Amino acid sequence: MVGGGGVKFIEMDIRDKEAYELAKEWFDEVVVSIKFNEEVDKEKLREARKEYGKVAILLSNPKPSLVRDTVQKFKSYLIYVESNDLRVIRYSIEKGVDAIISPWVNRKDPGIDHVLAKLMVKKNVALGFSLRPLLYSNPYERANLLRFMMKAWKLVEKYKVRRFLTSSAQEKWDVRYPRDLISLGVVIGMEIPQAKASISMYPEIILKRLKY
């Protein structure tokens, strides 16, 4: 086992075939996210599941209606929402998507607050802390992103929100070792055991919902 000691390390958000092949070497399990901006393509999902096994629907800046329809029609897939629109973030949490990923990107705040954190706990919605935005930002942007991630982590820790650390790799060069994701967790305020749990225990809890 990659994680060792019976621990499975899980990469929850890989967005590219070559990235998947590399991540498979470094993680015990890998979830491939298929990105949709508008209507979800059933055939594309079926092909992805056949090829990769564990698949998530990634709704990028969706309208609330797309979130609603996806949650209703695709319960056997993980559903992630990536948006900086608070209205969409709240609606997605209320509808019970599996995860909100990096809501602080292109915002001037963490994208969640105490109210949303409590709602995430109630609806079993996880918060995904993605490394990728940090890789493609200038020093000023990176400092702000880290500041918002630290604030989000404090809310996650306080209210015991489900969480995971991920590379969100869109090409193989974005994939990172488990230890790198653990280091990201430490940088934003996690203790090492908390960071390890964010690529092992919490992803396992999230994956239990899948109905293949």
From Swiss-Prot:
Cysteine pairs bridged by disulfides in the record: none
Enzyme class, spelled out: hydrolase
Gene Ontology cellular-component annotations: cytoplasm; ribonuclease P complex
Domain of life: Archaea
InterPro entries (alphabetical): Pol/histidinol_Pase-like, RNase_P_comp-3_arc, RNase_P_p30
Reaction(s) catalysed by this chain's protein: Endonucleolytic cleavage of RNA, removing 5'-extranucleotides from tRNA precursor
Keywords in alphabetical order: Cytoplasm, Endonuclease, Hydrolase, Nuclease, tRNA processing
Main localization (coarse): cytoplasm
Thermal dependence summary for this entry: Optimum temperature is 70 degrees Celsius.
Variant or mutagenesis effect after changing R176A: 45% reconstituted RNase P activity
Location of the protein in the cell: Cytoplasm
Biological processes annotated in GO: tRNA 5'-leader removal
Effect the entry attributes to changing R90A: 45% reconstituted RNase P activity
MF term (GO), any: ribonuclease P activity
UniProt subunit comment: Consists of a catalytic RNA component and at least 5 protein subunits. Forms a heterotetrameric subcomplex with Rnp2. Reconstituted enzyme missing individual protein subunits is suboptimally active, showing each subunit contributes to optimization of activity.
Function noted in UniProt: Part of ribonuclease P, a protein complex that generates mature tRNA molecules by cleaving their 5'-ends. Not absolutely essential for activity in vitro, however it strongly stimulates activity. Binds RNase P RNA.
Family membership: Belongs to the eukaryotic/archaeal RNase P protein component 3 family.
NCBIfam families: PRK03892.1
Protein name per the record: Ribonuclease P protein component 3
Gene: rnp3
